[in-house]
Curated annotation (Swiss-Prot):
EC number per UniProt: 1.8.1.9
Designated name of the protein: Thioredoxin reductase 3
Cysteine disulfide links: 212-217
Residues annotated as catalytic: 625
Example of a GO cellular component annotation carried by this entry: endoplasmic reticulum
Expression sites by tissue: Expressed preferentially in testis where it is found in spermatids and spermatocytes but not in sperm. In elongating spermatids, expressed at the site of mitochondrial sheath formation. Low levels in other tissues including heart, lung, liver, kidney, brain, muscle and prostate.
Compartmental location: Cytoplasm; Nucleus; Microsome; Endoplasmic reticulum
Major subcellular site: cytoplasm
Record remark: domains: The N-terminal glutaredoxin domain does not contain the C-X-X-C redox-active motif normally found in glutaredoxins but activity may be mediated through a single cysteine. The C-terminal Cys-Sec motif of one subunit of the homodimer may transfer electrons from the thiol-disulfide center to the glutaredoxin domain of the other subunit.
Annotated organism of origin: Mus musculus
Keywords: Cytoplasm, Developmental protein, Differentiation, Disulfide bond, Electron transport, Endoplasmic reticulum, FAD, Flavoprotein, Methylation, Microsome, NADP, Nucleus, Oxidoreductase, Phosphoprotein, Redox-active center, Selenocysteine, Spermatogenesis, Transport
UniProt modified residues of type Phosphoserine: 50
Lineage summary: Eukaryota, Metazoa, Chordata, Craniata, Vertebrata
Length: 652
């Protein structure tokens, strides 16, 4: 940013070359000025539309739009104003006091000014003047410009980044990276996204969109749905549906349909980036200097790019055991969702949410499934809820082998699937066990993709224990122009919606007129096991750690969904509880639900928790009957009372 001149020079007019490029606008009030207001001499008059028309044709309108964008993109500060407007005068005086060169177009002194303002409104979504753009970013009107000046955002926008190829380069084309890229492009910035999928040890790769779209949330939820449909077919007979044909599942048909949908999403992302003017490069990004990055494509060809700012959004990949046969014969979630053959008898190693979700839908599709657990289920989640999830999985036929970890995977037979022998050792002693499986699925955690992108060359610090990147409350690393979002952040939730929100807000802070930060508190999530587990806020263990047990009240109950009654599904399996801070008006600090459609139910309660939900507010809420969600409006029994919470029927 240029320093304000002292004393300010007298006003002087400079004719801007920008209008000459536009051509359709008379050069009456467009000029460049430093340190004072400007009154440029009138220039050649040209009409916006053909003589005799009151409104430009569609072709002329598009031409006008293009030329207005040329003005916005070609000038550091572009002010659309009216000569008699006092608010416009205030803005001009502000930039003059800052010693900043600005360009103006007085809409009351151009031919067809109303049409110009109409198209400008479509571009900026602002009907009034002054209408200010700084470095291609729409700042807004007078009040927003002064607000941006007061909070420092205007000075940030005025920084000249023209020395670099791009305003922003994002490494990683997942949910967070794409969200950040699209928002930055919306703010008028020149953006590049680098995305490259290193094939899994089994050779699996995928398109643009990251883990969630390709090998995570989307295919996982669709396979979960496939399993639920199978269960619904069993219930259907109790509801009077008759069918004689034997029902069986076709794995190949399911994966083909799911991959077709994912392919459409990949293409949609590429189209969206193109429409927004974001450069997408399918290459591996690696820092070589503070503002310089090397992009290597699959052919090994290298290209170098520079940017003013960088966002690291590289995500994570599944971890391997580091034992004989793991990478040769085991698969991970990277491979499962596009597996071209039915996995058959499957051993799932690990009891993370990924492991239990996969075990759940595989069992729901009729497969023989065993889960090998080293320690606890769903580490980091409420452990009472985790054990209930495990119990329901066992009811659905999933077998658990606890306190064991594999030490060898050996191929006995080749095939699709083949046959594998797994040798596992007890975590509590010398005991070993063996098992024969068609497929071994590893779900033991994920590693951040941060160690091979040249961070050490520019001094970005990482947590050496887990590869994650420490950032401040605005996602900034220890290197000021380098930021990070998503699963690679140290100590932050590894959830797609979190990355999307963080990416969008980061772009707005970097290039817009917003100071809003991502709220990492009270984030809802759902584990999509056959009986879904939704939660928001603190686990019971974490709440006790933070508030002490004597300061908490836990309300809970079992319940029986109406839909389960006719089908004869087990009563007293679904469970709901809230954890309340007794000394903060019984504010709800933890929300937990095990039941059908838990994700859909939890979403709404998460919004309520952000607004300070209390037990009294729940009591005052009239429930929708008959639904599962209404159970939270009638909670009466506390854990401390020790009273029985079993239910006799669906209505309590």
């Amino acid at each position: 940013m240029e320093k304000p001149p002292s004393p300010p020079p007298p006003p002087r007019a400079q004719t801007s070359p920008g209008l000459g490029k536009v051509g359709v606008l008379p050069n009456r009030r467009l000029g460049a000025v430093r340190g004072g207001l400007m009154s440029s001499p009138p220039g050649r008059r040209a009409r916006l539309a053909s003589p005799g028309t009151s409104r430009p044709s569609s072709e002329a309108r598009e031409e006008l739009r293009r030329r207005l964008r040329d003005l916005i993109e070609g000038n550091r500060v572009m002010i659309f104003s009216k000569s008699y407007c006092p608010h416009s005068t205030r803005v001009k005086e502000l930039f003059s006091s800052l010693g900043v060169v600005y360009n103006i177009l007085e809409l009351d002194q151009v031919d067809d000014g109303a049409s110009v303002q109409e198209v400008l409104t479509e571009i900026s979504n602002q009907k009034t003047v002054p209408n200010i753009f700084v470095n291609k970013v729409h700042v807004g009107g007078c009040d927003r410009t002064f607000q941006a000046h007061q909070n420092g955002l205007l000075q940030k926008l005025l920084q000249d980044d023209s020395a670099h190829d791009y305003d922003l380069i994002i490494i990683g084309g997942g949910s967070g990276g794409l969200s950040c890229a699209k928002e930055a492009a919306n703010l008028g910035k020149k953006v590049m996204v680098l995305d490259f999928v290193v094939p899994s040890p089994q050779g699996t790769t995928w398109g643009l969109g990251g883990t969630c779209v390709n090998v995570g949330c989307i295919p996982k939820k669709l396979m979960h749905q496939a399993a639920l449909l199978g269960h619904a077919l069993q219930d259907a007979k109790k509801y009077g549906w008759e069918y004689n044909q034997q029902v069986k599942h076709n794995w190949e048909a399911m994966t083909e349909a799911i991959q077709s949908h994912i392919g459409s999403l990949n293409w949609g992302y590429r189209v969206t980036l193109r429409e927004k003017g974001v450069t997408y490069v399918n290459s591996f990004g690696e820092f070589v200097d503070l503002h310089k990055i090397k992009a290597t494509n699959k052919k090994g060809q290298e290209t170098f790019y520079t940017a003013s700012k960088f966002v690291i959004a590289t995500g994570e990949r599944p971890r391997y055991l580091g034992i004989q046969g793991d990478k040769e014969y085991c698969i991970t979630s990277d491979d499962l969702f596009s597996l071209p053959y039915c996995p058959g008898c499957t051993l799932v190693v690990g009891a993370s949410y990924v492991g239990l979700e996969c075990a759940g839908f595989l069992a729901g599709l009729g497969l023989d499934v065993t889960v090998m657990v080293r320690s606890v289920l769903l580490r980091g989640f409420d452990q009472e809820m985790a054990e209930k999830v495990g119990s329901y999985l066992e009811q659905q036929g999933v077998k658990f082998q606890r306190k064991f970890t594999p030490i060898l995977v050996q191929q006995l037979e080749k095939g699709l699937p083949g046959k594998l022998k797994v040798v596992a050792k007890s975590t509590e002693g010398p005991e070993t066990v063996e098992g024969i499986y068609n497929t071994v699925l590893l779900a033991i955690g994920r590693d951040s993709c941060t160690r091979k992108i040249g961070l050490e060359k520019i001094g970005v610090k990482i947590n050496e224990k887990n590869g994650k990147i420490p950032v401040n409350d605005v996602e900034q690393t220890n290197v000021p122009h380098v930021y990070a979002i998503g699963d690679i952040l140290d100590g932050k939730p590894e959830l797609t919606p979190v990355a999307i929100q963080a990416g969008k807000l980061l772009a707005r802070r970097l290039f817009g007129v917003s100071l809003e930060k991502c709220d990492y508190i009270n984030i809802p999530t759902t584990v999509f096991t056959p009986l879904e587990y939704g939660c928001c806020g603190l686990s019971e263990e974490k709440a006790i750690e933070m508030y002490k047990k004597e300061n908490l009240e836990v309300y809970h109950t079992l319940f029986w969904p109406l839909e389960w009654t006719v089908a004869g599904r087990d009563n007293n399996t679904c469970y709901a509880k809230i954890i309340c801070n007794k000394f903060d008006n019984e504010r709800v600090v933890g929300f937990h639900l095990l039941g059908p459609n838990a994700g859909e139910i939890t979403q709404g309660f998460a919004a309520a928790m952000k607004c300070g939900l209390t037990k009294q507010l729940l009591d005052d809420t009239i429930g929708i009957h008959p639904t599962c969600g209404e159970v939270f409006t009638t909670l009466e029994i506390t854990k401390s009372s020790g009273l029985d919470i079993t239910q006799k029927g669906c209505u309590g």
